[in-house]
Design a protein with these regions (language model features):
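Generic enzyme active-site microenvironment
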Residues: 167, 310, 405, 458-459
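Short, well-ordered beta-to-alpha junction loops that form the rim of enzyme active sites
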Residues: 170-173, 228-230, 407-410, 559-562
Length: 576
């Protein structure tokens, strides 16, 4: 019927691939990540022709992690394109990561010809069922006429309420159907006009809850403001700064909340975390969940009498945690309303308030202890010596500050304590799920989202290995990314087994946690025209950082670490 319409109209024909690309471009998509192949290669090419930059990866997992991080960094859904069947399955890594972190992302996969479903078609899979645990909303365009509405729906649902992943299924037969160019435009306009605007509207804030929150903070003796990546996603930094500085309340960021207010701010309680959460009597938690990262908001880490004020865009999250007060709303909007309410009747703890002094004194004490350790130049490297050198180099870049990507066990844990974030959305790490393998995908997303910033990845050798082949992607697109690999020869280090542990018929095999000693990771990127460095001393590392930061070209710095440095499972030894 579509072909007959085209014949009558006389206008050029548009196939399903082109209509998907047109709809994506009209919906504001300007970047896509993915791996092409049957049946979506033409779709990628048509999108590029319409002005959408397509970043082609080697593996859908890394591409999916890139799409999820791009959604977080830009506030617009990151789009992942995959082939059918196994390509869609590989894409679930990124989709599930987006769901866990509440980041907007759209997974688009080709699928089997509908006439062959159930007969063992090429890469056949019930992909709608496969994505269900991780997708807020899924659509299948069963006819070319349904493509525009399906595209707009998955885009809108990705950002609606609590952001997350959505899925669009494109059967191969639909991608080859055609309509006239005029009909394609009519379908797109119809889909645009039919968008549910209420879906993407921010929730209305209950003003009485704002008043109650201010009263709780006003009466508190030891208040604390906690904010996370939800506040970063909402661009709440200006409101948070005004709120903190007008009230004098100390603040504690979650790992990816770091930088919303500078780690060097006088009211930052990061270095006094245990004291801050253990003694506060009222905690305003903005865009952060009381999950394992926050010890579930329970004793003994938190006081049994603490009163939580939870600010979250998702009512279900507040209902789950049962705080003293919950405010459903966009983090930026809520914080600004809190500040306005306080501004009309101000209060401030002041620099000499006992609670503020206690936090500052503990911060000073703990920072001094850390600096003593950082001042030691230990060779062979432990984790602290190279981390201090990296910290100083990153701070030396100035503004705009580099985006830091951090993954690993000990590498990420030590980096969280040592590396300093001074600007919003400049730290990406394993996140809510503690996902390993995100590093190179995150680097690529950061470089594409913020081309004016240097991207610096500080990776354990295990974390790097998940996505190491994507250094070719860095080189192919000439992205300003410096990857620093902490090479200690294994998942947590080299072979640390006692002799009495090495038994059984395969005792000559390497330990399950160990890699090839002295692996030349820096040579990998040289195969693709990038620059590699080997650094085993402070001077070698300083020189490599200075040169690579100045060049802003794809680089891998292989930092050799004592295989016995660090602890198994990092700070989560009790879980292993």
């Amino acid at each position: 019927m579509a072909d007959a319409d085209q014949e009558r109209s006389g206008s050029p024909e548009v196939d399903g691939n082109t209509l998907v690309a047109m709809s994506l471009a009209r919906a504001g998509v300007d970047r896509m990540f993915g791996v092409v192949g049957i049946p979506v290669t033409s779709l990628a090419n048509r999108a590029v022709a319409l002005g959408v930059r397509f970043i082609a990866f080697h593996n859908e997992q890394s591409a999916g992690y890139a799409a999820s991080a791009y959604g977080y960094l830009t506030g617009r859904p990151g789009v992942l394109l995959t082939v059918s069947g196994p390509g869609c399955v590989h894409g679930l890594a990124g989709l599930s990561n987006a769901a866990a972190n509440a980041w907007p992302m759209v997974l688009i996969s080709g699928s089997s010809d509908q006439s062959f479903i159930g007969r063992g078609d090429f890469q056949e899979l019930d992909q709608i069922a496969a994505v269900k645990p991780f997708s807020k909303f899924s659509a299948k365009a069963t006819d070319i006429s349904r493509i525009p509405a399906s595209v707009f729906s998955v885009i809108d649902w990705a950002v609606a309420g609590r952001p997350g992943g959505t899925y669009l299924d494109l059967p191969s037969d639909v991608l080859h159907q055609t309509v006239s160019e005029s009909e394609a435009e009519r379908l797109i306009i119809q889909a645009e006009n039919g968008r549910n605007k209420e879906l993407i509207e921010k929730p209305r804030i209950n003003y009485s809850e704002i008043q109650k929150a201010v009263e709780l903070l006003r009466k508190a003796q030891r208040p604390l403001i906690v904010f996370g990546k939800g506040a970063a996603y909402a661009r709440a930094e200006n409101g948070l700064r005004k709120l903190v500085e007008s009230t004098g309340i100390p603040f504690l960021p979650t790992p990816m909340g770091k930088g919303l207010l500078s780690d060097t701010h006088e009211l930052a309680a990061t270095a006094a975390r245990s004291l801050a959460i253990g003694k506060c009597d009222v905690a305003l938690v903005v865009g952060a969940r009381l999950n394992w990262l926050m010890h579930f908001g329970e004793p003994p880490k938190w006081s049994k009498d603490v009163k939580f004020i939870l600010v979250d865009v998702c009512k279900e999250e507040i209902d789950l945690r049962k705080p003293s007060l919950g405010i459903v709303g966009d983090a930026k909007d809520v914080v600004e309303k809190l500040h306005k309410e306080i501004k009309d009747d101000p209060f401030c703890l002041g620099k000499t308030h006992p609670w503020v002094e206690a936090i500052k004194n503990k911060v000073k004490e703990n920072v001094a202890k850390m600096e003593v350790q950082l001042a030691k130049e230990v060779v062979p490297f432990n984790f602290l010596t190279p981390m201090k050198i990296i910290r100083d180099a990153i701070l030396g870049v100035g503004s705009p500050a580099p985006i830091l990507v951090s993954e690993g066990a000990n590498t990420m844990d030590v980096g969280r304590s040592v590396l300093v974030q001074t600007e919003p959305r400049t730290r990406l790490d394993a996140g809510t799920w503690g996902t390993m393998g995100v590093g190179l995908g995150y680097c690529i997303a950061a470089a594409v989202a913020s081309p004016d910033r240097l991207v610096v990845a500080v990776e354990g050798d295990s974390g790097f290995g998940f996505s190491a082949m994507e250094v070719e992607t860095l080189a192919r697109y000439q992205l300003p990314v410096v990857v620093i690999v902490f090479n200690n020869g294994g998942v947590y280090g080299g072979d640390r087994r006692n002799p009495d542990e090495i038994t059984g018929p395969y005792k000559k095999d390497p330990a399950p946690t160990s890699f090839v000693p002295g692996a030349a990771y820096h040579v990998l990127i040289e195969a693709f025209g990038g620059k590699g460095y080997l650094a085993g001393t402070p001077d070698e590392l300083k020189s490599a950082l200075a040169e690579s930061f100045s060049a802003r070209k794809p680089t891998v710095i292989n930092v050799t670490i004592d295989p016995y440095a660090g602890a198994e499972s990092g700070r989560l030894q009790h879980k292993n």
